[in-house]
Regions:
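Inter-lobe coupling linker of SF2 helicases/translocases
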Residues: 1-89, 93, 105
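Short, glycine/serine-rich, charged loops/turns that create anion-binding
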Residues: 75, 81, 123-125, 159
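Phosphate/oxyanion-binding active-site loops and adjacent basic polyanion-contact surfaces
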Residues: 88-100, 130-135
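A Trp-anchored, charged/polar loop motif used as the substrate-binding/catalytic surface
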Residues: 93-107, 161-165, 169-171
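Short, high-confidence coil segments that cap the C-terminus of an alpha-helix
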Residues: 112-114, 175-176
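Conserved RecA-like ASCE P-loop NTPase motor core of nucleic-acid helicases/translocases
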Residues: 115-123
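Conserved helicase motor "Helicase C" RecA-like lobe of SF1/SF2 P-loop NTPases
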Residues: 123-154
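Conserved helicase ATPase core of P-loop NTP-dependent helicases/translocases
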Residues: 139, 148-182
Length: 182
């Protein structure tokens, strides 16, 4: 059915790619950081290993614990240990704090040109229920450093095409300088 759908779509659509239009596109800069785990994260990883051994040995009911749950907990732990336990400390050299430092530095360096940066995070999106999430933590830390709150937006807060168009206009104008999304 897909080939037929594409054929019908092409009858009504005029498709132009950015290559065909020769549009100017700024060069993206990707920053990869290698960080050491906190002591709490090291303890959690050891616990994940023990859980995995129990699952492999069939000692745990799969509805209580399984490899998918362990993997998901590992992803959360790697991002921020507070995603597994909000009472754990905010590790000084965490991925979140490193991201905040980098984002603030880029924001400072781009003040004159009002440059924009995108931060992608597919875990811990804001739910609005008061639980810890990475998005609010990043925004709070950036505003504490002096970035105006209105210059930081979450794509999730713009849930219609009209709102998204307004957001992207603000991004292009340099009114929103940090956009977070998943």
């Amino acid at each position: 059915n897909l080939p037929e759908l594409i054929s019908i779509f092409k009858e009504a659509a005029d498709i132009q790619t950015s290559d065909m239009l020769n549009l100017p596109v700024p060069e993206a800069e990707f920053i990869n950081e290698v960080l050491k785990p906190s002591e709490e994260q090291q303890d959690m990883v050891a616990a994940f290993s023990e859980r995995a051994e129990s699952v492999r040995a069939g000692m745990v009911n799969p509805t209580e614990d399984n490899m998918l749950k362990i993997t998901n907990d590992g992803r959360k732990c790697a991002l921020d240990q507070r995603l597994l336990n909000e009472l754990l400390p905010d590790a000084e050299k965490s991925k979140i704090n490193t991201c905040v430092e980098n984002a603030f530095q880029v924001w400072e360096e781009g003040k004159a040109d009002r440059t924009t940066q995108l931060i992608f995070c597919d875990l811990s999106t804001p739910k609005g229920d008061g639980t810890f999430n990475v998005y609010d933590d990043v925004r709070n830390k950036l505003t504490e450093k002096g970035i105006p709150k209105e210059e930081i937006a979450f794509i999730h807060e713009y849930n219609t095409e009209t709102k998204k168009a307004d957001l992207f206009a603000k991004v292009r104008a340099g009114q929103v300088r940090i956009l977070m999304g998943s």
